[in-house]
């Protein structure tokens, strides 16, 4: 997973490095479309995807605005037995919050890096990809380098439930469809008292929007807005067969407020 995009050769080069070290490894792409430099967006992607992979899986993740600085390159082993090769910039925060931290080590062993001069701007090629490939090839995690006693953490915003309703955050777009993904768990939303088919008013970035709570997109006419619980069990906002983000000019980060059923919308 990276923020490299696919319009240049960076991803192909990283994969070539991996294959040259671990030719039998199965390399799968999570995404290379993380918004450039948005560490939290990348972290949320890792959080969302990693539960579907088995113990022993090696994830290489590069969203690294601090490349070439004093920030550490690390390998994290979770208590679930998965490995994450990435910069120590908080990219791993939501994963270890959920799965627990077994150990973290700084990548200092030169034999785990590309055997050439290390670029100051392409650690994805020179450090993260070869380190991940060595792990996938069965090299001992303990040989990566010294233990990192404390990791850099992201300060993640979380939804808050009160007697008035839920205040949450728009944390991502479901591209290419442009749906707004929030951090409000489906179970928390359901405690507000709404039933499928209910139509009500919410606030997105403090602007009122009237929309129905439905199960899926075709439960409303084409072009209408809707609120639904997505496949990750998060409240999401969409337009049936259109791009909500482009239609209404809303992008993350942002805020959302949903009042309890029967309660007045929050004062402006």
Describe the role of every protein-language-model region:
Residues 116-188, 192-194:
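Anionic-ligand-binding alpha/beta catalytic cores of soluble enzymes and soluble regulatory domains
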Residues 243, 253-264:
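Pepsin/retropepsin-fold aspartyl endopeptidases
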Residues 1-33:
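N-terminal glycine-rich anion-binding loop in soluble enzyme alpha/beta folds
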Residues 13-17, 45-48, 94, 130-134:
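Alpha-helical scaffold segments in soluble metabolic enzymes
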Residues 3, 131, 240:
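A residue-level signal for conserved active-site and pocket-lining positions in enzyme catalytic cores
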Residues 181-249:
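A conserved acidic, glycine/proline-rich C-terminal tail/linker
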Residues 4-8, 66-69, 244-247:
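Short acidic, Gly/Ser-rich segments with clustered Asp/Glu that frequently serve as metal-coordination loops
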Residues 9, 21-27, 38-44, 53-62, ...:
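Active-site histidine-anchored catalytic micro-motif
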């Amino acid at each position: 997973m990276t923020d490299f995009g696919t319009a240049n050769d960076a991803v192909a080069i990283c994969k070539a490095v991996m294959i040259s070290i671990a030719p039998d490894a199965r390399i799968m792409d999570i995404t290379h479309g993380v918004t450039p430099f948005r560490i939290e967006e990348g972290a949320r992607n890792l959080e969302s995807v990693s539960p579907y992979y088995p113990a022993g899986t090696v994830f290489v993740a590069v969203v690294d605005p601090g490349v070439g600085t004093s920030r550490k390159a690390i390998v994290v082993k979770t208590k679930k037995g998965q490995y994450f090769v990435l910069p120590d910039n908080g990219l791993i925060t939501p994963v270890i919050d959920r799965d627990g931290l077994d150990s973290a080590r700084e990548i200092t062993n030169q034999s785990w890096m590309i055997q050439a001069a290390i670029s100051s701007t392409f650690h994805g090629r020179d450090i993260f990809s070869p380190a991940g490939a060595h792990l996938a090839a069965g090299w001992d995690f303990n040989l990566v380098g010294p233990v990192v006693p404390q990791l850099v953490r992201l300060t993640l915003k979380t939804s808050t439930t009160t007697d008035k309703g839920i205040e949450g955050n728009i944390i991502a777009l479901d591209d290419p469809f442009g749906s707004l993904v929030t951090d409000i768990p489906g179970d928390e939303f359901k405690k507000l008292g709404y039933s499928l088919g209910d139509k009500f008013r919410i606030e997105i970035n403090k602007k009122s929007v009237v929309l129905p709570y439905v199960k899926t997109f075709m439960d409303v006419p084409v072009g209408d807005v809707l609120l639904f619980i997505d496949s990750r069990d998060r409240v999401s906002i969409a337009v049936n067969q259109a791009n909500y983000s482009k239609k209404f000019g809303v992008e993350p980060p942002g805020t959302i407020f949903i009042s309890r059923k029967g309660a007045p919308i929050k004062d402006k």
